[in-house]
């Protein structure tokens, strides 16, 4: 009977027992159940080695973060207190017209500032890196710049006899020096050497704000502060004792265009002129930046369209694996 039942079973279901749940096929480990994906039970999840931080660890990290923030705040407060204890004042930030992203220098102010330098500052300070040709197209025409250069006698030579001679200035000449050498400059200014003003705005922290504040910041020394003879109190100058007498005051000169020469106006104009002297490419740099922004506005959409045209087909392409037959 058992042999007959087994024969009938093989006849109906086949030799491998296909169709019976749990029937295992020869040559396969685990039979049909080996093809099923393993299930992640709650017990299996709880046995994972990567668990979240505990409550104590969270509290410790929060405490460390609060301590770090408190230490940083204390350091900033102590640094500010030390800076506030200094007697030197930091210049405020003034609303200059050329501070805008696309704003240019005030060329009318540059012209007035050159007049201030020529009539007031050039008696002590040099500008070794600025020539008369640099003024052309900025604040003077070529004819006006030539006339300014011809007002100055420049030493040239040697001539055919081997001697130096004096000639009228040319556009290629640089601004004349007030002193022949640094020793003569110190001797004429009680031992102080007047700095060159060609790059003074870029060389001082605060730029034109510092120049304006220094020129308008002269005042009487506070009670208890004594200065030796020949020094003046200026809170914006390092050490507060400066050897330069107050160079400007109201009506120190008369502008050619009739602008009232108040102290603040004179300081503003000469600071703008020195700003241009330190960075003559200021307007050109911003003009090129504007052109680059316009070009980028045209190129970015074109680049995006080319990227979409190039990669949209590749991104939507599907790969199918076809096993060899």
UniProtKB/Swiss-Prot annotation:
Residue ranges annotated as Mitochondrial matrix topological domain: 309-325
Ranges of residues in domain Cytochrome c: 108-209
GO molecular function: heme binding; metal ion binding; ubiquinol-cytochrome-c reductase activity
Entry's Gene Ontology cellular component terms: mitochondrial inner membrane; mitochondrion; respiratory chain complex III
Catalytic reaction(s) noted: a quinol + 2 Fe(III)-[cytochrome c](out) = a quinone + 2 Fe(II)-[cytochrome c](out) + 2 H(+)(out)
Pfam annotation, one family: Cytochrom_C1
Entry EC no(s): 7.1.1.8
Localization in the cell: Mitochondrion inner membrane
InterPro entries given in the database record: Cyt_c-like_dom, Cyt_c-like_dom_sf, Cyt_c1, Cyt_c1_TM_anchor_C
Domain of life according to the entry: Eukaryota
Cofactor: heme c
Transit peptide: 1-84
Protein topology in the membrane: Single-pass membrane protein
UniProt topological domain (Mitochondrial intermembrane) ranges: 85-287
Functional note: Component of the ubiquinol-cytochrome c oxidoreductase, a multisubunit transmembrane complex that is part of the mitochondrial electron transport chain which drives oxidative phosphorylation.
Quaternary structure and interacting proteins, as annotated: Component of the ubiquinol-cytochrome c oxidoreductase (cytochrome b-c1 complex, complex III, CIII), a multisubunit enzyme composed of 11 subunits. The complex is composed of 3 respiratory subunits cytochrome b, cytochrome c1 and Rieske protein UQCRFS1, 2 core protein subunits UQCRC1/QCR1 and UQCRC2/QCR2, and 6 low-molecular weight protein subunits UQCRH/QCR6, UQCRB/QCR7, UQCRQ/QCR8, UQCR10/QCR9, UQCR11/QCR10 and subunit 9, the cleavage product of Rieske protein UQCRFS1.
The name this protein goes by in its record: Cytochrome c1, heme protein, mitochondrial
Record gene name: Cyc1
């Amino acid at each position: 009977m058992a042999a007959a039942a087994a024969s009938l079973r093989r006849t109906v279901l086949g030799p491998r027992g296909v169709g019976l749940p749990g029937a295992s096929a020869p040559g396969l480990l685990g039979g049909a159940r080996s093809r099923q994906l393993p299930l992640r039970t709650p017990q299996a999840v709880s046995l994972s080695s990567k668990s979240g931080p505990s409550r104590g660890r969270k509290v410790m990290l929060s405490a460390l973060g609060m301590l770090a923030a408190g230490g940083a705040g204390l350091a900033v407060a102590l640094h500010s207190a030390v800076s506030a204890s200094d007697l030197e004042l930091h210049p405020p930030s003034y609303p200059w017209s050329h501070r805008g992203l696309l704003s240019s220098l005030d060329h009318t102010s540059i012209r007035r500032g050159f007049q201030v330098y020529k009539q007031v500052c050039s008696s002590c300070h040099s500008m070794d890196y600025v020539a008369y040709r640099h003024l052309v197209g900025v604040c003077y025409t070529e004819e006006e710049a030539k006339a300014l250069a011809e007002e100055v006698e420049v030493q040239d030579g040697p001539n055919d006899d081997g001697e130096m001679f004096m000639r009228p200035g040319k556009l290629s000449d640089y601004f004349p020096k007030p002193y022949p050498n640094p020793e003569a400059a110190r001797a004429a200014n009680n031992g102080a050497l007047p700095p060159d003003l060609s790059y003074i705005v870029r060389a001082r922290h605060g730029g034109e704000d510092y120049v304006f504040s220094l020129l308008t910041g002269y005042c009487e020394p506070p009670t208890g502060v004594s200065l030796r003879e020949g020094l003046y109190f200026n809170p914006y100058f390092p050490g507060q004792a400066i050897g330069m007498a107050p160079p400007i005051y109201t009506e120190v000169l008369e502008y050619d265009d009739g602008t009232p020469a108040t102290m603040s106006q004179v300081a503003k104009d000469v600071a703008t002129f020195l700003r241009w002297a330190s960075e003559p490419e200021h307007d050109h740099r911003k003009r090129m930046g504007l052109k680059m922004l316009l070009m980028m506005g045209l190129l970015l959409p074109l680049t995006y369209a080319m990227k979409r045209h190039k990669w949209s087909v590749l991104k939507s392409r599907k790969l199918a694996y076809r096993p060899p037959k």
